[in-house]
Amino acid sequence: MTFEELNQKWIEDQVTDGNPLQRSTFNRHRDAILNIVGLIIECDQANGYKYYIANPEVLEDDSIERWLFSTLTVSTILSESVAVKDRIILENVPAGEYYLPVLIQAMKLNRRIVMGYQRFDGEPYEKTVEPYSLRLCKQRWYLLVFTGHHIATYALDRMLSVEMTDETFEMPEDFSPEAYFAEYYGVLTDETPMAHVVVRAYGRTSNYLRTLPLHPSQREVTSTEDYTDFCFDIRPTADFIGELLSYDVGLEVLQPADLRERIKRLLDQSLKHYS
């Protein structure tokens, strides 16, 4: 897209009140996009001075850049949709996002934090930890930390306070948050052994799993008019089991046998509430 084409799009946007796009304004926005999202916008002089994204790979699935880009895009669309704001319904995100700025700053500087925390079933306490990574899961933010003894995960909406200290730490060069969670679904990590899980999805559930896979290891094994079998190589923790149960009668666990039996016990226990 040439600068002239960009300018026309800019003028047509109601936010600009029809004012033309200045070259200096465009350059500032281009620099901001690079700093915030990591997208490099370059000009192809040999092709009519058209601007293009030089590194589209940063928008791959599950990347922070893709999430930021999507968030900014949606934010822009919503800001331009005041006339229909009462017809756009958003999910509530718990108040823990209030601590995101200080946590991100502590991660940038590799600073320890003092965190006030209270579990749902516990008393308030303070703890000094090393912030390694942030993870968003099911509308909740979680902080992955090193406590000085082990890796642990804390929910931001259970934090009572966060203070960045002057104490620095060194994050292990070989530690990858993505690799840490790779064998799990959700945020719960424990010693649950790896398993080759096969599930049978009935009706529309097959399409739900195709369009929004539960895990990167998800593969489609068999498909018929009535059902589709999917397999996973995963640690079937409580988070994963809870997700399987959320599909109600649309999903059946076939393998392994011990997981199938565990699901059956959970369903039997649930039925007792209605007896």
Model feature map: region roles:
Residues A182-S275:
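Polybasic (Lys/Arg-rich)
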Residues K50, V114, Y142-L144, D229, ...:
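General beta-strand recognition
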Residues I41, L134, V162, E220-V221:
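A structural signal for short hydrophobic beta-strand segments in well-ordered beta-sheet cores
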Residues F3-E5, D31-Q118:
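Bulky hydrophobic/aromatic content
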Residues T2-D17:
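DNA-recognition alpha helix
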Residues S81-V82, D86-V198:
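Core beta-strand-centered patch of the WYL/Sm-like small regulatory domain
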